């Protein structure tokens, strides 16, 4: 395990582990580990992502696959105040460490034909005792229009006053003839 600047234990996973992760909301081998009294958001990401200039993924149209795997855990009363559209309040942020360009997006995966579900109503006293955990796996290029060039990004996720740990992702151009 690695320790970040705040002294928190962080998973140290090889970049290759993220190659087979698909977008969705499943827990997987790249999901950060949290303890029972954790409240907030944690993310994992590959340290390095390689891309071939001019090549696009036939399914996504993106120049690379930059996966972030995350977990969030909050008290029920906190999430209840954000309902029915919690997802519309989660923000993804990537900051270019050299140029200091900031890229942001809400993690909205809206289907305009699907209305937001009405949340069940529970007494506040009940919600204060309940903790809700959710997982997410996203390709940040589905949300952010990052330029196709070598760069290093500091990436994090926020929800109201909560901010995840910061991960650093380096985009590296594959040289001609280099294997994946």
Feature annotation, model-predicted:
Residues 4, 8-11, 15, 39-48, ...:
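Contiguous segments within soluble domain cores/interaction surfaces
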Residues 28-40:
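Proline/serine/threonine-rich low-complexity linkers at boundaries of modular beta-sandwich domains
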Residues 73-75, 143, 160-162:
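Short coil/turn motifs at secondary-structure junctions
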Residues 100, 134-138, 144, 167-174:
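Generic detection of short hydrophobic beta-strand segments and adjacent strand-loop junctions
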Residues 133, 150, 159-171:
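Short Trp-Ser/Thr-centered turn/loop motifs at beta-strand boundaries
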Residues 142-152:
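Short glycine/proline/serine/threonine-rich loop/turn segments at secondary-structure transition edges
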Residues 174-180:
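Low-complexity, Pro/Ser/Thr- and charge-rich linker/hinge segments at domain boundaries
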